[in-house]
Amino acid sequence: MTRRVETVAVVGRDAALWLAAAAVQRSLGAAGVRVVAVELPSWLNAVDCYSTLPSLASMHRLLGIDEAKMLEAASGVPVAAQRFSNWSKGAAPFFLAYDDEPPPSGDLPFSQYWLKGHKEGLRVGLEDFSLGCACAKLGRVPVATGDGGELSASYGYSLDASIYAEALKQLASKRGIVSSSGKIADVTLKGDCIRSIELDDGTRIEADLFIDASGAERVLMMKMPGAKFERWKDQFGCDRIITASAAPLKSLPAFSQISAFRGGWVGLYPLRDRTAVVAVYASDVVSDHSMPGELPLLARMAVSGEAVVAEIKPGMLERPWIGNCVAVGDAAIALEPVDAAQLHVAQGCISHLIAVFPATADEMPEASAYNKSMRSFAGNIRDFALAHYVLNRRFDELFWDKAREAEVPATLRQKLDLFAARGTVAIGDDETFSDQNWTLLMLGAGVEPDGYDPRIDLLPDEPQIEKVQQRLRAVSQLARQMPSVDQFVGRTEQLQAAGVV
């Protein structure tokens, strides 16, 4: 009789380590799977922040994490959207929000109604028909109303990275996950499988399955036969990230701010006790020496404390599962944080792994399915991030001119061409970003579709006009009913007591 996987060793650091360990234990512990965590030295600094997509909430529900307590512990703030500015010189900023997909009804996407109206003189932008965008502009949090209506939106988070990772570690400990800490001194292989790892203190750990959550170090995966990291250097010109802190904002916004400049972009992420400042840039345009001095000017905020610079290398492992070793998070797929997808990548890898968790400890044909899904998953996220650069309109700047001319993957080219023709997005398997996300991005970047779905013309004009007007009224009314960010996090009373509001 074939033997099942009994022990899983998760080797890594920070949030990815503890999310993976806790999720595997929660999902498979009752089936007899024992999880061991090996904690490597943290790469986080006090200034670091996790900016997340709404999908993280589903991971929290799986792990039984109380949202309010988590946000309070990690100085967290709900984020309804991202606001992009200066990606096209002279163009107005635009929002990317997280509206929920309506239930299937056979109707065409609302964006097609809007597009026809726009071509016939409608002067109201699509953002005003998005509940998430409306909430972001008003400083509101799109919470569930429970009325069963089609209009709903979700929100991501801004989280203090170190505190959040520590909270996950404590959760794993409470769930009975045994952990060790140190550095990897040796990895013992037999064929294409890991038999054991040894820590620098002499501790030896054996397991049936090893999960590499070590980030860019890929401490286990790069020991595996045939392991290769595929750089996306030709698509992404930024190779540095700098993080710092600024004072907390007097009134918490419902969005993060992403502003382009001559050599990259700078992001402002609201937290309760500070504002995280992150810039991603090309070191051949802006030097590491000059960037800390430029950061306050770019952020338009005084920066306090030390700014930390690190190298980034976007790309992915050609095979994130080899033998009995599986990479998750940044170890599998490395992205710059322009779309707040870092923890979503970790979550996506973990979810795919659990879905194809090996049935036996001796042979693991599930690796092929995982590798195929991860390539599709990574390619879709890469394409969305790349679209920001390819569609930029910052002309006569070497970095941005080069970004527009970058080689575009066929999957992205298909989306761009189809949208330019008829305002439609080709959504495939393993997509992270919805039709609405892509539509807001391309319209915000200045793409003007030549036409629209011809089926719209089969409907009488009067019902179309009423549908558009009703949607606009409903979004405006519902957004104003939502709580402000300060109300959501319970900060209103504190501000009033301090005489701030």
Predicted regions and their residues:
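Conserved mid-domain beta->alpha element of the FAD-binding
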Residues: 315-381
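Conserved N-terminal helical subregion
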Residues: 94-186
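Dinucleotide-binding Rossmann-like beta1-alpha1 core, especially the glycine-rich loop
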Residues: 47-133
